[in-house]
């Protein structure tokens, strides 16, 4: 039991154990470089193959991935960006210091992703990009979204932080739009020792720019410097090749977002486990679906043929009594979360002119209807049994109370 909960939300979204420890131990014992080495290259190649993109470039967090991806959009003052309100703040934070107009697009009431019908009505001649999230691992309606974006030259950024292991008609998020971003935070479907991110894309020019940006903007030629003989100074004589070359041509501010070799090595091991980790999530989700669907006034996320939900988040909906149900579940030791508070109602976006009524579906679902239950591979069979029993009992109690009141 974690804290006061018999069935807690994930502090770790995957299983990390002996295999990961052995990978890190072997790296330490090898004496190999601990940054920007072979493991990073292998992890990126493996990830690109899984997603189906030409490039996968690792960075230190999902937030950094989003920051660098948004830079590729080359937004100018007066440009408009259409974004989902149903997301964690990191998706939109890089826009706060840009002189662009954000237009929030309301969400589909089942998938909680951008509603393509509403999206079309928000497009103007100034629309430069669409920022979407594959909420909880349920993929957005990408065919309809891209049919709107492509003819108009609008770039589509996929925040796929929830969607590793998700399938979309034989393809995968991160390779459906123009650029994709993933997170390997501790709670995500796989982790790289707590933090990490990946950017997936096909464009050569963007890949080159991102690679430079994550490596201190080193984009120039490498030329011999004063450490070449006969100019080797005494204090350099034990430095091998470290000081023998100097980069020229650095033109812009850069950063160091290099994923450590230990993190990349763990990521490789986690990729081997991905299918089984996601399958466990789907099994738990199936148990919950079967239990919840029996009760009137509830809705589950039914998944159509061709869609493979990865269930980073398990979401369901009630017509009435959501807050009573949350309290009933807490009393039975089940942790419940509500993700996410609509971004257009947060102080930073209200200050920019957004407010209540702008996205009525997102508002109604958050305040009255939707909720997230634990659905992660760290749950034991006994915990899953308790979860299903607690959900059923709590729904019965809430329904009985409403019937007596009526």
Regions found by a protein language model. Name each.
Residues 71-160, 167:
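PLP-dependent aminotransferase-like
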């Amino acid at each position: 039991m974690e804290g006061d909960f018999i069935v807690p939300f994930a502090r770790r979204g995957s299983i990390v154990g002996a295999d990961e420890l052995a990978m890190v131990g072997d790296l330490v014992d090898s004496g190999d470089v601990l940054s920007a080495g072979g493991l990073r290259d292998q992890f990126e190649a493996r990830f690109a193959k899984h997603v189906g993109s030409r490039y996968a470039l690792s960075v230190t967090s999902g937030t950094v991935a989003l920051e660098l991806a948004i830079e590729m959009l080359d937004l100018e003052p007066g440009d408009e960006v259409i974004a989902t309100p149903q997301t964690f703040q990191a998706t939109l934070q890089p826009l706060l210091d840009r002189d662009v107009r954000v237009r929030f697009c309301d969400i589909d009431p089942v998938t909680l992703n951008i509603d393509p019908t509403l999206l079309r009505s928000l497009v103007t001649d100034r629309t430069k990009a669409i920022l979407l999230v594959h909420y909880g691992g349920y993929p957005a309606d990408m065919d309809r979204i891209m049919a709107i974006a492509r003819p108009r030259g609008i770039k589509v950024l996929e925040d796929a932080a929830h969607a590793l292991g998700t399938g979309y008609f034989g393809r995968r998020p991160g390779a459906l739009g123009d650029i994709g971003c993933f997170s390997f935070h501790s709670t995500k479907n796989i982790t790289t020792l707590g933090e990490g991110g990946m950017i997936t894309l096909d464009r050569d020019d963007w890949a080159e720019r991102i690679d430079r940006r994550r490596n201190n903007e080193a984009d120039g030629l490498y030329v011999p410097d004063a450490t070449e003989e006969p100019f080797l100074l005494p204090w350099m004589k034990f430095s091998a090749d470290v000081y023998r070359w100097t980069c020229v041509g650095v033109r812009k501010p850069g950063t160091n977002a290099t994923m450590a070799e230990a993190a990349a090595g763990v990521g490789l091991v986690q990729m081997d486990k991905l299918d089984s980790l996601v399958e466990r999530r789907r099994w738990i989700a199936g148990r919950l679906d079967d239990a919840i669907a029996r009760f009137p006034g509830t809705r589950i996320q039914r998944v159509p043929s061709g869609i493979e939900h990865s269930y980073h988040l398990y979401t369901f909906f009630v017509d009435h009594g959501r807050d009573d149900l949350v309290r009933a579940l807490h009393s039975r030791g089940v942790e419940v979360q509500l993700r996410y508070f609509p971004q257009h109602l947060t102080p930073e976006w209200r200050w920019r002119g957004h407010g209540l009524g702008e996205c009525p579906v997102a508002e109604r679902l958050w305040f009255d209807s939707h909720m997230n239950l634990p659905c992660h591979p760290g749950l034991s069979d006994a915990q899953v049994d308790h979860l299903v029993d607690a959900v059923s009992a709590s729904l019965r109690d809430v329904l009985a109370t409403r019937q007596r009141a009526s």
